[in-house]
Amino acid sequence: MLKPLWKAAVAPTWPCSMPPRRPWDREAGTLQVLGALAVLWLGSVALICLLWQVPRPPTWGQVQPKDVPRSWEHGSSPAWEPLEAEARQQRDSCQLVLVESIPQDLPSAAGSPSAQPLGQAWLQLLDTAQESVHVASYYWSLTGPDIGVNDSSSQLGEALLQKLQQLLGRNISLAVATSSPTLARTSTDLQVLAARGAHVRQVPMGRLTRGVLHSKFWVVDGRHIYMGSANMDWRSLTQVKELGAVIYNCSHLAQDLEKTFQTYWVLGVPKAVLPKTWPQNFSSHFNRFQPFHGLFDGVPTTAYFSASPPALCPQGRTRDLEALLAVMGSAQEFIYASVMEYFPTTRFSHPPRYWPVLDNALRAAAFGKGVRVRLLVGCGLNTDPTMFPYLRSLQALSNPAANVSVDVKVFIVPVGNHSNIPFSRVNHSKFMVTEKAAYIGTSNWSEDYFSSTAGVGLVVTQSPGAQPAGATVQEQLRQLFERDWSSRYAVGLDGQAPGQDCVWQG
């Protein structure tokens, strides 16, 4: 603990009675007081001059011009803060749009609900950029040659890379925080962008937390947001099933998510260490106890972002696991979840540990409150088959006679004539919906993703019946889930997987 430079003044103690002062005593006392004041004044001036010349070190995490995106180089705040922030917030007219990727050759039923295509949404979001684009991403692989594949389905990713280069050519700042080491060892995307002026930082999460940076979100101009399951990978646009959300014209939420981006950014400098306590400027004012309240297309809405792991949650930030459990705990009617992986264990520790936190929450909701639980899990050629006993165990709790309803299905994307594309053709979504709230995240459901891996979540609640022109966000997400649940690509655990598109064969 730092000691103060000087002690607080203490009132002098005087005797209860004193002899009367003589006139010359008063004069002498006055001269002494004046002399003391003069000495103090001269000393203060000397001290101020001395301190003025001493450079003061920045606080931990303070932004320095050489370390920040170009849009920050004239101060320690993003380009849109603080001069324009208040004015922009007054002009906020928040809008949330669900976005998704449907793999090629995976037709949905005619007239079924759908979200905006992800590739289209990303390109439109970049078209709105005027000052800066900040991207947090697990890895980058936007071109076919990145993985040695020549396939027309990579064209959308290549168009996205070209769009980003065009933004840099228009002097729009691009800052990227990505995980190190990376899965995309042969990708040149970030080198290409850096050569055009992009600022790239690799965050050594393995050294810092023994995890990875698994987040996937954008902050554009401190005003618009994308977040969801999709990586910066061309396969996420055409070969993998994804779901996310774009939020437009919502600077309060965008600048809150920007604080999470900044936690990654400051950890991307050489020899960075995790702080014991994050500085106040990283703190969030929005969380599950005090969410953002605003109008989304005129509809009263509450929303907040969560984050993981706990070490990357400054004061006020709700932990991602806590957000998931809170949404589950508030459900009274149903919990529908779509995730790529479901393990009530660790996935990347040896030996693995049992971790039934989410599993217990689903069981408690179904058994204790009669909540209808549906879990839709992805399966592809790279799926770990040891997941399926856990899924069967969860479904075994179901007992309609006792009003306990737990159903599990496996979503299988047919490989078809796309076998030349590795690590694709899978449901990669990570979302949950209840009658009260929508949760969209970036994490698979196992312990490591919440204890050591960097991820984010978005929790949104809209008032039923407050939107005469359309459904609430949670209703829209429920419709998308039920579309997938009732499709021919969703197979019950008591069924049989068609073809050779999944490691599990029923």
Swiss-Prot record:
The chain crosses the membrane at residues 31-51. Its EC number is 3.1.16.1, 3.1.4.-. Changing Q255L: No effect on exonuclease activity toward ssDNA substrate. Changing S283L: Tends to form aggregates. Decreases exonuclease activity toward ssDNA substrate. Gene3D superfamilies: Endonuclease Chain A. Changing L183G: Loss of exonuclease activity toward ssDNA substrate. Changing F348A: Loss of exonuclease activity toward ssDNA. It is found in: Endoplasmic reticulum membrane; Golgi apparatus, trans-Golgi network membrane; Nucleus; Early endosome. Glycans are attached at N150, N171, N249, N281, N403, N417, N427, N444. Disulfide bonds join C94-C250, C379-C502. One of its GO terms (cellular component) is phagocytic vesicle. The catalytic domain contains two conserved PLD phosphodiesterase HxK(x4)D(E) motifs that accomodate the phosphate group of the nucleic acid substrates, with one nucleophile histidine residue forming a phosphohistidine intermediate and the other histidine protonating the leaving 5'-OH ssDNA/RNA fragment, resulting in the cleavage of the phosphodiester bond. The homodimer has two independent catalytic domains arranged at the dimer interface. Homodimer. This is 5'-3' exonuclease PLD4. It comes from Homo sapiens (Human).
